[in-house]
Amino acid sequence: MNTHGFFRRLWPPRSEKKTPPCWPVPSAKQPITDTPLVVFDLETTGLNQRKDQVISIGAVKILPAGLPMRSSFYELLNIPLDKYPRDGQLIHGLTQHDLQQGKDPATALESFLHYAQNHLWFAFHAEFDRHMLSRAVQQYLGVHYDPAPIDIALLAPLLNPGHNGLIYLDDWLNHFGLDNSTRHNALGDALATAELLLILKQQALRAGYHSWAEVLLAAQRHQKLGQQQNTALLMF
């Protein structure tokens, strides 16, 4: 009796784990002046981080020399229709027909990650986009990936003392007199956010910061101090 074949049928060999693709992200400890950046924005079917889906991705690169206007990324994702309203209502100006013209989600996501690799990631109110992107990559590519984007909404109050009341992206765009007329899709939002980040980058350099890690640490401390001060005021 071929016992080897018998036991192989009972316990088939485990399939080898697929090595996940590598989309490297540079260290935030590198000098600000030498670090290429990517600003991204997602549009989703809603704000439920467990159930809603990513429907479009927009991104813009910022190189050490500045903002190359032609280096942008935008894709619609052809997600299953049961994840999208069937009554023809618009979400972010998109219809079911628009969505059906989009790319296969796995293809779109892989293209985006390839586009963004070797760049330090940024987003405005980044935590939501971070979670939604990581979940989509897990769902469609079967790998865990977290580029840990830096939250621009956290950096702006640090570099602009006395303007803690500015919360939303439009608030900051209006504050700096930046044009927000392009904000009609994920790419428009990413472009507007990139223009804001360029201003913050110059402010960080003038303030004496050498790396984005230093700016982020100072911003986290600034936020914590503000929260403590607000708590103290509520106690009186």
Can you annotate each of these PLM segments?
Residues H163-D179:
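A polyampholytic, Gly/Pro-enriched intrinsically disordered region
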Residues V143-I150:
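Short hydrophobic/aromatic-enriched beta-strand-loop microsegments
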Residues S134, A194-K201:
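Short, amphipathic alpha-helical segments that act as regulatory/interfacial helices
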Residues Q139, L158, H175, I199-Q203:
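Active-site catalytic microenvironments for nucleophilic, acid-base chemistry
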Residues N185-L196:
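Acidic, divalent-metal-coordinating active-site segment for phosphoryl/phosphodiester hydrolysis
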Residues I150-N164:
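Short alpha-helix plus adjacent loop in nuclease-associated cores
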Residues N2-S27, L198-F236:
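Acidic two-metal-ion nuclease catalytic site recognized across multiple nuclease folds
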Residues R9-S134, Q138, D146, N174-H184, ...:
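Conserved non-catalytic scaffold segment of RNase H-like nuclease domains
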